[in-house]
Amino acid sequence: LKKGLMLNVDYRLRTPNSYQLKTKSGKWGMIAYSNEIHSVMIGYKRGRFTGGIDSSGWVKENPEKWEKLQDIAVWNESAFKKANIEVYNKQKAFCDNHIEPEYRIGGGIFTTLSANRYHIGQSSKMGAHVDSGDLNAGMTTMSCFREGDYDGAYLVFPRYGIAIDAPDNSVIIADSNQVHGVTQIEGKGQGYRSIPEITVR
């Protein structure tokens, strides 16, 4: 956000962590901006303007990597089923009834995968937020990978006073409809998070 812009004049908050700019026509822009984070959306999503469902640009540009990344969704789905079969069955029923198999990663219960990287140079933390577009009845899974040594980068849920320091090659299962964020990372290492989810928007 540029210096000198005034709240509710030049921009307005869409969420506590994102904002919309006023366009030259005097209307609020359709795109919401937020703090920069090294992240990419991978998988299937409905087009913002067309309404059609298609694979993301990243998938089209990286077909070999896409084939390998789909394994993350399979492992996360297995962990989800083992951890909470009741919620898993609700999420699977939603997918079976409302989402065609060709728009699910590996034919499973997830439609998209967000890949985030945290390191001190860029994307060192993520502000508190609620994931928009996630299935209300479901839960989100997160694969966590570590490269090198670092402290911080805890997944936090402020409402519950919880901060999770995820070990390498672990899966976290949580409700992304609750306010959450990632604390500041410290050190030379990097943290990678892959989050398969159902996007319903």
Predicted regions located by residue number:
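A short beta-strand-loop-beta hairpin characteristic of the jelly-roll/cupin
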Residues: 145-167
